[in-house]
Amino acid sequence: MAVGEPLVHIRVTLLLLWFGMFLSISGHSQARPSQYFTSPEVVIPLKVISRGRGAKAPGWLSYSLRFGGQRYIVHMRVNKLLFAAHLPVFTYTEQHALLQDQPFIQDDCYYHGYVEGVPESLVALSTCSGGFLGMLQINDLVYEIKPISVSATFEHLVYKIDSDDTQFPPMRCGLTEEKIAHQMELQLSYNFTLKQSSFVGWWTHQRFVELVVVVDNIRYLFSQSNATTVQHEVFNVVNIVDSFYHPLEVDVILTGIDIWTASNPLPTSGDLDNVLEDFSIWKNYNLNNRLQHDVAHLFIKDTQGMKLGVAYVKGICQNPFNTGVDVFEDNRLVVFAITLGHELGHNLGMQHDTQWCVCELQWCIMHAYRKVTTKFSNCSYAQYWDSTISSGLCIQPPPYPGNIFRLKYCGNLVVEEGEECDCGTIRQCAKDPCCLLNCTLHPGAACAFGICCKDCKFLPSGTLCRQQVGECDLPEWCNGTSHQCPDDVYVQDGISCNVNAFCYEKTCNNHDIQCKEIFGQDARSASQSCYQEINTQGNRFGHCGIVGTTYVKCWTPDIMCGRVQCENVGVIPNLIEHSTVQQFHLNDTTCWGTDYHLGMAIPDIGEVKDGTVCGPEKICIRKKCASMVHLSQACQPKTCNMRGICNNKQHCHCNHEWAPPYCKDKGYGGSADSGPPPKNNMEGLNVMGKLRYLSLLCLLPLVAFLLFCLHVLFKKRTKSKEDEEG
């Protein structure tokens, strides 16, 4: 691949731009570390089964490990946001042709957790290979654990990573604090317009950094030219780095991997500043059009330079400066993860720590010298927060699977314009009986995917494809000519349901139902005085919404539409993290509720749901008690001749034995939107419905037999009585 001439030309242009006005480059100096710092200990993790009141919530695993002269109990649960859906992996042929695959990735074997009884401890492990691989941080000590592959007794090796100068020489960033400060002054003038960005939504702390990792050819060769090995190394490193960022409410999500399996398209040895510059140019022309990302990092196995990594400070989302280069010299995952965490911190606006910067440990991740640590300092928090607010919201929403790919082509498992299907790679298509490699249907196949497609054929008309969920929902059936299930339709807003409730957007809500969902079946909605007292306070326990950073007090007419208040609570539920239960005594009443504070990225279980009754002929709509008059009256029971119910598209969904559109003529039910229901009502029943139906059929003979026995017994008693009288 010829890259020399265009790189030189573009490099000169970019140097003039970068030197005067853009982002500073930071670097970590490098030494020649030994393979591991201490002799390992052999440990055998033992699973701990928790019982009784001390049992962990579902989804947690607990193991006991003994090392360093002590026994530790590790609690961990699956890290669910590590990968983007359908993670693409790019490789190259010997002729430098691009190949793309979406390999099966076991996404339920990467864990985050903590050590029992050790505040601020941190655990990041994977169990994908059958044993534990990853990091344990206990107080000021950091350990790396690896399984012994040939062990028949689940043995592992635990290495303590020391910070002694004799084993971990002091390594200095290649950029001085003075130079960073000077370049930041230049950057402030360049980024002036960014300071005017909208602050809407800034209080939601949760951020999602979409990371693409590129692995150079030398590192690939070091991994025995095994792309799968490279992938697993990347997964484990990113899982560890993600654990560093969780206290900042940041999820680092891997959205793609690019492995230079043929050769390096640019020099990766020598001065890392040049490597970073060249990589930024390469990314701009080769990666941006393929993968969505906030930042891209190049992993290299450099053994000549004197730096561990470089990155553009505040480069996040600022193409082409949203890049970093990290030296992955050996197999020490934890040590390299600290380097990646540091360089990614620079991308997010963090500078090197000064003497006034502190964290829970002796050293912090953004220290100018490389230190064994897992915590960010107070300075890093402040710099990240300032940088995130001022640079917009590019890292706020999680990646949507459909947006990961930017290059439309046959073979990416996404059915695009002009394609009948897309079975993916050659290997995947070989196993697909319905779709061909050229994204057309196999001869004789009617479909290749969809709820209403089975064995390459459309499911028969009247096959249930979407079951009714609750009394405010409606079922849908396949039409026999399409692979898709009809759009989801539900009962029209404003139709009564349950007791003193109305359907609204597919659900039946009232205050009592919500209290039972939170506090159990005995709970019920509190008196109106609780709503009046609490929801007019304008705090996290009682409010009618959030504007900017301020909780809005409820006006008296809207108090029933703020936060739900309950009574008759006997049990405090296990709520999601960051949730708080409030008990408030008001005269002879105890009011119970939950909080919702700024920065929470989980659903608010305590806000009164839209559609909840708040007065006669009134329901809550967006924290306001609104009249139901505004709800559509285009369809009413009379429209359906009292033989059906109106759906959200203002069409009649007819009862069985009546036909749409107005339930006037004989038919089989359904609506113009639901697809045709089965002619035999039994065909439309779900599995549970069929079981209940069959159970009833089985009971009928038994009931008949019992009635017969009672009849015989009655006749005998009557005859016996007549004999006695005679």
Curated annotation (Swiss-Prot):
Specify where it is mainly localized.
membrane
Instruction: Give me the Gene Ontology terms describing cellular component.
Output: external side of plasma membrane; plasma membrane; sperm head plasma membrane
Task: Pinpoint the Disintegrin domain residues.
Answer: 407-493
Q: Which cofactor does it need?
A: Zn(2+)
User: Mind telling me which Pfam families this protein's record contains?
Assistant: ADAM_CR, Disintegrin, Pep_M12B_propep, Reprolysin
Record topological domains on the Extracellular side: 207-693
Q: In which tissues is it expressed?
A: Testis specific.
- Which residues are named in the active-site annotation? E343
Description of post-translational modifications: Has no obvious cleavage site for furin endopeptidase, suggesting that the proteolytic processing is regulated.
What's noted on cofactor binding? Binds 1 zinc ion per subunit.
Q: Which residues, if any, are the signal sequence? A: 1-31
Keyword Glycoprotein belongs to the record: yes
User: GO molecular function of the protein, one example?
Assistant: metallopeptidase activity
Q: What is the E.C. number?
A: 3.4.24.-
Report residue numbers covered by any propeptide: 32-206
Q: Where does Zn(2+) bind?
A: C173, H342, H346, H352
| S-S bonds | C317-C394, C357-C379, C359-C364, C465-C485, C635-C646, C640-C652, C654-C663
Q: Any transmembrane segments, and where?
A: 694-714
Q: Where is this motif: Cysteine switch?
A: 171-178
Q: Which residues lie on this side of the membrane: Cytoplasmic?
A: 715-726
Name where it's found: Membrane
Domain Peptidase M12B, which positions?
207-400
Q: Which UniProt keywords apply?
A: Disulfide bond, EGF-like domain, Glycoprotein, Hydrolase, Membrane, Metal-binding, Metalloprotease, Protease, Signal, Transmembrane, Transmembrane helix, Zinc, Zymogen
Q: What does this protein do?
A: May be involved in sperm maturation and/or fertilization.
Entry comment, domain topic: A tripeptide motif (VGE) within disintegrin-like domain could be involved in the binding to egg integrin receptor and thus could mediate sperm/egg binding.
What name is this protein filed under? Disintegrin and metalloproteinase domain-containing protein 20
Q: Which organism is it from?
A: Homo sapiens
Annotated gene: ADAM20
